[in-house]
Each structure stands twice: as structure tokens, then as C-alpha cells.
Amino acid sequence: MLKFVILVCSVACVFGAVVPGGMLPQLDGRIVGGFEADIEDFPWQVSIQRGGYHFCGGSIYSPEIIVTAAHCLEKIDASQLRVRVGGSYWDEEGSLLTVSNFKIHEKYDAMIMWYDVALLKLSSKLTYGATVKNIELAKETPPDNADAVVSGWGTIYENYPYMPVQLRSVDVKIVSREVCRSDEYGYGNAIGPTMICAYAVGKDACQGDSGGPLVVGEALVGVVSWGEGCAYPGFPGVYTDVSVVRSWITENAKSF
């Protein structure tokens, strides 16, 4: 059964995407099967907030630019957004910054979730340190079965009514586009050319971790996008492949 748990009003207000086969974007914030984490281990991770609540994740690309998912920013105004950086907790620590503008990929399609990527421009520049740091963009798609880690904030069990405030992370394995659309898994042709998957039994990013980082080594390889339920057997998490949209990110980060 498809899952979409509305935990706070801000989540309900921002939701607007329709994904392949009725599957839903990961908007309510949970890392399933993971562990509590410290921001010093994920200094590129940010919490994107609206109305005082976390609803999506993101990654620091430069002192002014945050990479996130396009579906996080549908039907929303930049003035409503806040970004917390440098904190292990989405409701405290670090700095809470305003957003001056954002840009959604021109080819983003909410019906099929292709090009699910966007950029936020902060109103003030970040100062890098132990808890605030950018992450490099992957230049190529990682190989099948590569070790990866995904991080974010949110509930730790499906249908769990509370959203923990501390950052969490989970180790997963990369599933290539070809394998993810094969009979081994349940998505078929819903996996498009701008997507990559990651999977581990009982482990996953889920709704609300949207826009957050999938990392291999020291590179951002994916942006949390969509999936079937939370850690459902046979259904990997689906991410925007950063190597595919890398040139769009670098070019647009300079121009707005």
C-alpha cells in the first residue's frame, strides 16, 4: 500500500507532485532502519523548513546554493522557506537562514518525476566550518552495488506519528537504472534516464527526506526523490542521478 503520512501542515501545503504509478514523493521525513547521526559527519546536510517545521532535506553546493528536489518546491514561495545549516537537530543548533530565490529544473515533470532537482539561493552566504561544508557533485553514475549513505530527519517507523528532531543516516547499496527497472524489482519502466536507485533490506529514505543527499565516498550522487512505501521489499528508494543533472546545477548556480 502506498504511504503518505501528513505530519504537519507545512507538509500538506507543499505536496503537489504525482509520481509514476501513483507512487508518492518522500515528503514527511523519515530514515528507516538507520541510526542517529552528527552533523559533523554530514556537514553538507540542511533542513528545509516551512511554518517552523522541517519538510525536506538538501545539500550545500556553495556558500549561497542548496541542491534539493523540485517536488519540494511546488506551489510555494521563497519567502515562506527557511534553511537550517550546521545543526544535528532540525529545530535547534546551527543557523536558520532565509531564502531569496529558487529555481526548478525546466524539464521537471511531476507526472513521471524526471529531472526532480532544484536550487535554493540563500539570502546570505555561509561560512564553512566543521558543521557547515559543501559537497562535490558526482561526475558519473556510481556502479551497481556501490556502498552509499542517505541522511535526513524524520520518523523511524512507517506510520510512526512523531518526527524525531535528530539527524539520522542509513547505509544502502546503489542499484543501477538497468537493474532497478528489471524484473528483480517492482518499478519497471517508471525508472527514467534521470534516476538512480538505492536499496537495503529494511532500510530506506522515505517521505520528508525528499531533496536530501545520497552520497558515495565524498560525492553527492543522488537527490532523494520518490518511492513505494518505506523500505518495502523489492522497491528501492529512487533518487535523481546527480551526474545527469550536474551541468544544469553548475550552470544555474552561477546565473541566479
From Swiss-Prot:
Keywords: Disulfide bond, Hydrolase, Protease, Secreted, Serine protease, Signal, Zymogen. Residues 1-22 form the signal peptide. One of its GO terms (molecular function) is serine-type endopeptidase activity. Its EC number is 3.4.21.-. Disulfide bonds join C56-C72, C180-C197, C206-C230. The keyword DNA-binding does not apply. It is found in: Secreted. GO terms for cellular component: extracellular region. The active site is at H71 (charge relay system), D116 (charge relay system), S210 (charge relay system). PROSITE patterns: TRYPSIN_DOM (PS50240), TRYPSIN_HIS (PS00134), TRYPSIN_SER (PS00135). Belongs to the peptidase S1 family. This is Hypodermin-B.
